[in-house]
Each structure stands twice: as C-alpha cells, then as structure tokens.
C-alpha cells in the first residue's frame, strides 16, 4: 500500500516534466517565459493582491507588512513585560498577562508601531517623553526599532528623536528624555 502511495508523486512529476518538455518553445524562450511567470506569481503573492505586480528591490524592507505578536521583556529589576492597560496607562508586569501581548507592525523601513491587543490601544510617547495608550494611530505612535549588540531591541520615538521607551526597576515607565540606549532599562527582548 505504501509503495503505491509513493508512486503517485513520481507519476505526477513525470507527467509534468513531459508536458513542459513538449511545449512548442525554444530553450531560451521557455526559460524566459517560465521566469516571467514565476516572477509574476511571486510578486502577486508578495503583494497579496491578485493580478497586481509588486516591484521587489534590495532596498525594500523585508519585514514590511509582517505583523509580529510578541511580549516585550525588559531585564531590569526582577524583569518586566511592558503592558498597555485599557485606561491608557503603560507599565511593566513581571508575569505575562493578556495586556502584555503586543502586535509589532512595521509602518516604514525600520519604524514600527506597538499595539496592545487586549486594550486595543497603541503605545505612544508625548513631547515630554511620557508613555501613554492611544486609541488612534498618530505620529507619536511610531518608534524606530534598533537591534542592539546584545540581541535586545531599543525603541526610539520617531517624532521625538533621542527619547526611548524605558521601564524602571520597579516596573514603572521612565520618561524618554531621561534615558539613553546604553542603559539596560531601554533594552527589550521580543518574546513569543
């Protein structure tokens, strides 16, 4: 019985090879046609829009459009996961909970938004460096994500450069203008 099941894929591949070989194109035309078909299929699947071709280049962000569900862990004090509460407060909690699950979505090359799934709020930073939860996406919700040498990430406000997301050793947020990326309280490990 298993021998018969193993023969089915071999027969299908053989049939496909014969069909391709019998096409009325020369070798170079066949390769060009297959290459164009593959490029079109690949670009359509990347764009996720049937029939629309998307230009792929080396400069394009490989994470553009990929949303990641993660918990951001800061190894300061006893270790905290950043959480977004329904009332808009943001702080750190030692144990994982439903408010610490974030959707990290790219909005530009190297720039992400952090969205609290349960609270339905974006992480945002105001001009004074204070973190808050925003119901609506705006410029204060954009953060530059930087991979650090220790494999942690730092999140710098896009609107207010030099201000970073940070948690203190007690789990409370620190003002973004009082910290730097060299401080461990700005280092976050995205965890599944």
Swiss-Prot record:
Originating organism: Xenopus laevis
Stored PROSITE patterns: HBGF_FGF
Signal peptide: 1-22
Gene Ontology CC entries for this record: cytoplasm; extracellular space
PANTHER family: FIBROBLAST GROWTH FACTOR
Entry annotated with the keyword Disulfide bond: no
CDD domains found in the cross-reference section: beta-trefoil_FGF4
Transmembrane segments: none
Known role: Plays an important role in the regulation of embryonic development, cell proliferation, and cell differentiation. Good candidate for an inducing factor with possible roles both in mesoderm induction at the blastula stage and in the formation of the anteroposterior axis at the gastrula stage.
Molecular function, one GO term: growth factor activity
Pfam families reported in the protein's UniProt record: FGF
Keyword hit for Secreted: yes
Location in or out of the cell: Secreted
Similarity remark: Belongs to the heparin-binding growth factors family.
Protein name: Fibroblast growth factor 4B
Keywords noted in UniProt: Developmental protein, Differentiation, Growth factor, Mitogen, Secreted, Signal
Induction section of the entry: By derriere.
GO biological process, one term: positive regulation of cell division
